[in-house]
Amino acid sequence: MNNEAVVEESISKPKSSKLKIAMIIGMLVVLICGYMVYSFNNNYMYNGKIANNVFVEDVNISLMTKEEAIALVNQNYKTEALSLIYNGKTFKILPEDIDLKYNVEEVVNSAYNYTKTDSYFENVKRLFQLEKANQNFTLENSFDEAKLSESLESIAEKINVPVKNAKLYISGGSFNVTPSTTGKEFDVGANKESIYEAINSRKYGEVSLKVNDINPKISTSMAKSVDTLLAQHSTTFSTSIAGRAENIKVSSNRISDVLLMPGEVYSYNNLTGIRTIANGYYNAPVIVNGDLEDAPGGGVCQTSTTLYNAVLYSGLKVEQVKNHSITSSYAPRGKDAMVNDSGSDLKFSNPYDHPIYVKSIVNGGTLTCQIYGNSADKPNVDIRIDTFPMGAKTYRIFKDASGNKIKTEYITTSVYKK
C-alpha cells in the first residue's frame, strides 16, 4: 500500500513540472508578442510619423512628421504668378490675387493617416503592402473664381478699345468724314480657358491673351462712298403761322443727317417722335377726318411729304406710305405722305450696295430734303401719276442713261374725300 503511494507521487511530479514549464513558456510568448506589438506600434503605427514609402507627387515624405512633410511639399510645389501677354505688354496675376494654392495640408494628413485607420489589422496590412510598393498621393489646386474674374475684368479695361463708326456730315455741298475705329474686345471666355489649362498643367509661365477685333458697322470707306446727290425735293410754307413753321423746323432737324446702310429701313416716326408739346412740338392746324383743327405737330406732314418726293426720285424702296384724307396744298394727289401717332408712317429702305445719306434743310420758308449716295447708284427716274375722280395711282419709271425704259414700278393708290 505504501509502495503504491510512492509510485503515484513519483509519477505526478514530472507532469506538474511540465505544466509549469509550459505556463512559463506561454507567458514568455505573450510577453514577447506584446513587446513586439508594442514595439511595432511605436515604431510604425503610432510613432507620430508617416509610414515608409509614402510619396506626395514625386516628393518622398517617408518617416516624416506632418509638419516636416508639409514644409517639404510646399518647398517643391509652389504656386507662381501668371504672366498674361498681349501686344508686348505683360499683365501679372499673383497667386494671392486669386487665392491660388495646393491642398498640401489635406494631402499630407491623408498620407499620415494612411496607416492609422480605425482598423488595426487594416493598418498592419497596409504597412506590409508598403514594403512591396509605394503609396502616392496627388495634389490638387484651387482658386477663387470670383477673384479671377475681377482680375480679368481689370485687365480687360486696360485692353478694350471701343469700336467707333465712321461719321458723315454734309453741309453746303461739302462731304466731311470722321474715320472709323476698329474696336478691341478682351475675350473673357477664351482667356479663362487658357488660364485654367495653365493652372491645371502647372505651367505658370506666359499665357497669350486672346483679344478680338470688332469691326465698325460703318467703315471709313463706306462713309466716303457717299459722293453725290441722288435726288432732292423742295416745298414752301408760310412763316406767318408760327406754330406750323416751328414744327416743320423741328421735324426737319430730327430727320436730317442720317446715314442709312444697305438694306436698312428708315422710319420717319421713329426719328421725329410722338407729336406732343412735351416733345418739342407746337399747336398748329392739322387735318382730322377731313377737317382742320389745332393740335401739337401741325405741319410735320409737309416735312414727310417733301422727304417722300425726294425718296421717289432717288430710287429708294418705299416700304410704307399713306395719303391725306384731303388734297394738300403743298403736293399734288399721289405725291403726299401723311403721318400720325396712330401708325401712319413714312418708311423706306436702301436698295443699293452703298450707304445713302438723308439731309433736310429749312431756309426761310423753303424746306428741302436731299438724298445723297454713291454716283454709281444715281438713278434716272420719272414719276407717273394716273388720276381718277377721287384719287390717283403712283408709278415710278426707271430708265437707262439713254432714256430707255427699264421697268415701271407701282408705288401706291391714294384716295381722297375731297
Give residue spans per PLM region.
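Well-ordered beta-sheet/strand-loop patches within structured domains
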Residues: 2-3, 154, 162, 169-171, ...
